[in-house]
């Protein structure tokens, strides 16, 4: 806190300080000298010297000045000399008080008054407790009262709460019952592994008869031994309260409240927060801390000898806490989290509304608050990126809806041999839509030279890749930077070079294909429309992609049709480092979604985990899931409501859809 105007009359001279040293032995020639000397000594904390300028008992006056500083737990005290009125041997001085109540508390400014009388020793302050504050009587003391707000909820789009209210034990003290405040608070802090200083600051200035909550711990983490040890400290007590702490879904997105990880709400918090307050550590809990927590009401009060409030001398009203509305849909979110239990390793699922880009669900298999790769991950999209490059081919004129896009068994391009996932080929009717249907990498790679890196990048940008989405939480829109060279451009056409995406960015691409317009994502409606405008796409070109995606599900992933309705989508596997990425990106009705499973490459020939999770997700949306999803199944154990097959898409062991043997040579289909 920067020095206030007291510096003005402190600077009025070092001569005043010298005068203060002499005045104790010589009569004060004017009331102003007495007032200045008294205020300077009081401000500097030299209470014995200050008491000498009064007509009161020096020990009692010094104690009263010391008590005021401790009762308010002052960080600093500054004064301004006001007008002095004099009538004969009497005078009255006004002075401005600037009392800094400490970190997290406001500054108390008020006007004080002190009467003076001329006597044998010159001018002296006529002492009474009203010198401390005009409204303070002899039998009263000062205190600071602090009342915090109940933490607000985070709600889904239908107003359903997304944060669980936990039973919390508040460890605190009744200051009046403590034999020694510093010793008792320090013992409690050591017992609970906390820093004692912020707790002491709270206790020193608090009304002594009121319970002061200092540290919160989840009820499940408090046992009889801990309660017993705490109860042996004089003045310590506990109370049970309910606090909105734990995210019931999407931990990385909602975030945790301070102390969640260690089952304790820490007093070591930044900003205008007190010991015992709740503070969001990450996610929406952190971003919207002020809205969710509000701010406490602080009052400077006078207390009688029984510790009862006699008057409120100053009050600073806090701001009310409130709820945060999100675009999440609790039922869709539960379906997403339940679906990821089919993934043996880590995985992500993001669902958005096709017409608006509003985020309906964001889930990670790990369930960790630190695992936000559903939004921030940087992954190769594999052939799911064909949704983008197919449009680039159409927009650049490299292909038309009716033109043939040859898809042989393999193609040598720039030193790399491109093959189809299943080793097959399209021998006739090799349109662009059918290349999409059967994930024909050879056909897409062959278009690269005509499409070119600029067209790929331009189309990707129009579908939000690389844009600044301006969500309240960290998110990656991906990037596209295709290097020159036939091989690089061909690899970019199948999402294996120069492009990185997140599951969120792919879900938005699927939404654009479904709706005809790309929309920036929205998570918290109150933030207003996203400044990034919508991008309208060519509907005739989109129809080619939609046809390919619809037929891909019909021919290669019929298990996704179990819940009825029209499902569109593409599946892919791509190696990134030592991880096999399994993708499914598609949409049904007004929900677009992207599933990414990070798998051991050794499991590639066993199961297409993203498609299995997609099937479970669609089933969960259609039929619902339990409120608490079953634990993850690391062994691939089937979750009730999930798909009934563990085979991958298009495995040659079983024909999964109507195919024409003349179209596909070498395998039943080109899917995998």
Q: Model regions: which residues?
A:
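Secretory targeting and sorting signals
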Residues: 2-27
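Conserved SxxK-family serine transpeptidase/carboxypeptidase catalytic domain
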Residues: 26, 80-82, 210-231, 237-256, ...
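Exposed beta-sheet edge and beta->alpha loop/turn motif
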Residues: 86-146, 548
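Small/polar-residue-rich segments within soluble enzyme cores
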Residues: 96, 117, 124-128, 132-134, ...
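Beta-lactam-recognizing serine transpeptidase/beta-lactamase-like catalytic domain environment
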Residues: 304-313, 345-378, 382, 392-599, ...
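Conserved, well-ordered alpha-helix/loop/beta-strand core segments that scaffold catalytic motifs
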Residues: 305-347
């Amino acid at each position: 806190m920067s020095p206030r105007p007291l510096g003005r009359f402190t600077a009025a001279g070092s001569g005043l300080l010298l005068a203060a040293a002499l005045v104790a032995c010589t009569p004060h020639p004017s009331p102003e000298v007495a007032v200045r000397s008294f205020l300077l000594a009081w401000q500097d904390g030299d209470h014995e010297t200050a008491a000498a300028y009064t007509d009161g008992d020096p020990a009692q006056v010094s104690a009263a000045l010391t008590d005021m500083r401790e009762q308010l737990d002052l960080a600093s005290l500054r004064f301004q000399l006001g007008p002095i009125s004099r009538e004969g041997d009497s005078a009255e001085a006004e002075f401005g008080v600037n009392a800094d109540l400490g970190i997290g508390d406001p500054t108390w400014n008020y006007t004080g008054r002190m009467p003076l009388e001329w006597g044998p020793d010159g001018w002296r302050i006529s002492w009474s407790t009203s010198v401390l504050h005009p409204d303070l009587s002899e039998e009263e003391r000062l205190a600071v009262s602090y009342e915090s707000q109940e933490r607000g909820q985070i709600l889904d789009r239908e107003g359903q709460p997304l944060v669980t209210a936990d039973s919390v034990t508040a460890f605190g003290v009744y200051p009046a019952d403590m034999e020694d405040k510093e010793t008792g608070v320090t013992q409690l802090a050591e017992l609970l592994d906390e820093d004692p200083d912020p707790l002491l600051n709270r206790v020193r200035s608090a009304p002594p008869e009121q319970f002061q909550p200092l540290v919160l711990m989840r009820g499940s983490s408090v046992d009889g031994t801990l309660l017993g040890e705490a109860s042996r400290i004089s003045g310590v007590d506990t109370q049970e309260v309910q606090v909105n702490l734990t995210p019931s879904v999407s931990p990385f997105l909602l975030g945790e409240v301070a102390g969640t990880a260690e089952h304790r709400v820490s007093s070591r918090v930044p900003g205008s927060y007190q010991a015992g307050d709740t503070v969001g550590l990450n996610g929406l809990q952190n971003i919207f801390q002020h809205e969710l927590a509000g701010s406490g009401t602080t009052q400077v009060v006078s207390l009688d000898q029984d510790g009862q409030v006699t008057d409120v001398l100053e009050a600073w009203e806090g701001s009310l806490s409130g709820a945060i509305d999100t675009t999440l849909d609790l039922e869709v979110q539960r379906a997403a989290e339940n679906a990821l239990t089919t993934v043996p390793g880590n995985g992500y699922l993001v669902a958005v509304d096709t017409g608006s880009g509003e985020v309906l669900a964001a889930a990670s298999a790990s369930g960790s608050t630190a695992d936000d790769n559903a939004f921030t991950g940087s992954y190769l999209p594999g052939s799911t990126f064909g949704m983008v490059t197919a449009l680039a081919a159409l927009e650049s004129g490299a292909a038309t809806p009716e033109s043939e896009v040859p898809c042989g068994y393999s193609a040598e391009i720039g030193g790399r041999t491109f093959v189809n996932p299943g080793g097959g080929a399209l021998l006739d009717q090799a349109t662009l839509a059918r290349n999409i249907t059967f994930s024909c990498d050879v056909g897409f790679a062959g278009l690269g030279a005509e499409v070119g890196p600029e067209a790929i990048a331009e189309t990707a940008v129009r579908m939000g890749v690389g844009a600044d989405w301006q969500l309240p939480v960290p998110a990656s829109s991906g990037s596209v930077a295709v290097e020159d060279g036939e091989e690089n451009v061909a690899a970019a056409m199948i999402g294996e070079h120069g492009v990185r995406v997140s599951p969120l960015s792919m879900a938005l691409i699927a939404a654009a294909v479904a709706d005809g317009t790309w929309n920036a994502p929205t998570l918290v409606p109150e933030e207003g429309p996203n400044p990034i405008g919508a991008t309208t796409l060519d509907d005739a070109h989109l129809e080619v992609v939609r046809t390919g995606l619809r037929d891909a599900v019909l021919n290669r992933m019929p298990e996704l049709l179990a819940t009825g309705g029209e499902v569109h989508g593409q599946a892919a596997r791509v190696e990134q480092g030592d991880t096999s990425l399994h993708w499914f990106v598609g949409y049904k009705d007004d929900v677009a979604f992207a599933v990414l499973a990070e798998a051991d490459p050794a499991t590639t020939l066993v199961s297409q985990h993203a498609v299995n999770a997609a099937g479970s997700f669609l089933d969960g949306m259609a039929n619902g899931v339990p409120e608490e999803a079953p634990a993850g199944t690391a062994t691939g154990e089937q979750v009730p409501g999930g798909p009934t097959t563990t085979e991958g898409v298009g495995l040659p062991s079983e024909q999964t859809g109507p195919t024409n043997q003349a179209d596909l040579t070498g395998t039943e289909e080109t899917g995998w």
